[in-house]
Amino acid sequence: MAYVIGLVLALGVAVLATGVGLDRDRAFYPVVMIVIAAYYVLFAVMGDSTRTLIAELLVMGAFAGVALLGFRFDLRLVAIALAAHGVFDFVHPHLIASSAVPQWWPAFCGSYDVVAAAYLAWLSRRPGTFVAPGRRSQLDVFADTGRIA
């Protein structure tokens, strides 16, 4: 059931954000990524050791860093980060021992992340959505020239 709720909630948020224009702002999905990554830090604060908190902060920092790079250069990096966080949700219990993470969380958050990533990638069909104004994506440069500029 957690998978279904994550999927439906992600689609609902995405469609609502598009419908009212929230995702026209380049910052929307990077902020979503940072907030999603912060939940494990919250769980660690609620009931885990300092060691777990530090591990969660490091992971959050990595995802937040990719989100910020995506905001600055190419939002497709944010879609990749969301998908990677979805995978991370499923391996998290094997990497970081945390007694405060609810049992249903990996299924819920993982499905939310993957659906949000897919939706953000789907939005890439809109020209100019993913690359910061005045920049060409390195992916586009590579496609045109076969080289990274």
Q: For the regions a protein language model found, what residue spans apply to each?
A:
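Structural signature of hydrophobic alpha-helical transmembrane segments
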Residues: 1-10, 50-58, 107
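N-terminal signal-anchor/start-transfer transmembrane helix
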Residues: 5-22
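Hydrophobic, membrane-inserted alpha-helices
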Residues: 11-15, 36-41, 58-66
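Membrane-water interface at the C-terminal end of transmembrane alpha helices
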Residues: 13-17, 68-76, 103, 111-135
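Membrane-helix interface "capping/anchor" motifs
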Residues: 20-29, 68-80
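Cytoplasmic-side transmembrane-helix entry/capping segments in multi-pass membrane proteins
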Residues: 26-35, 54-59, 78-84
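Membrane-helix boundary connector in multi-pass membrane proteins
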Residues: 72-80, 88-104
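Short, highly charged, low-complexity non-transmembrane loops/tails of multi-pass membrane proteins
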Residues: 129-149
